[in-house]
Amino acid sequence: MRLLTASVAIIAVLATVSARPAGFDFHALTESSGRPADSRGAGDGHALQEMLGGSQGPQRWRQAPKLTILVSVMEYEQGGDVEYLATDERLSDADIAELVRDLTDGLAVLTANTFEQFSSVSREIVAAGATVRVSRPDQIVAGRFNGLRRSVKTLGFGGRRARKDGTITAGAILLDSEFDRTSASRRLLRTHELGHALGYNHVHSRTSIMNPRIGVEPNDFDRAAALIAFRVPAFVASR
């Protein structure tokens, strides 16, 4: 496979990029411009470096994370990091079931079936006005947030915290409440933000689920990249 061959040449480059030890690394997804990324760009090797490299170096979970669903809709405040206030709105049982299903399906695809399930799935109801941290050891915390689209022009944020060796220790998925509640494209949003929580960065040079604008399903490139990130021994051992 051409992409697997290209990966051998850039594994060493990715492994030498210094990791950022502190802070939660969030990435945003915006609405589609109607112009998909150019699949002919600099080649799959360059796109792979965008997706798996970056200033932090390659990052991944070493074991299946726990998934925590915030039943309470949270209030997004611009400039916030990992603490947010709960509203009195709640996700329905059907909303939660769909969200868990989409994230579980995405987990399998984006880890090349290394993790087919989260190690556990839990729900959390937060009293209105109470503060919640979305950065928690060994967990990916996911929920709907009021005001993301309105205040910062984004559909969602996905992020993670990692140690210097590239091991991800916490992840978070912040979904714009209105978009996630009403859009037929919400599964793409959820999958994209999960990708960030799993260690992936934005891809600009070709079409990918990790493009910074919403629009495409996981494709052959994404599946091959997941195989490299989670299954290729040389890459896994590079951190």
Model-derived features: positions:
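Bacterial N-terminal signal peptides
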Residues: 6-15
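Positively charged n-region of N-terminal signal peptides that target proteins for export
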Residues: 1-5, 100
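Metalloprotease/metallohydrolase-associated module, dominated by Zn2+-dependent proteases
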Residues: 20-25, 157-185, 201-239
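Active-site recognition of the HExxH zinc-binding catalytic motif
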Residues: 188-200
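A generic secondary-structure signal marking the coil-to-beta-strand transition
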Residues: 63-65, 130, 171, 206
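Metzincin-family zinc-dependent endopeptidase catalytic domain
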Residues: 97-191
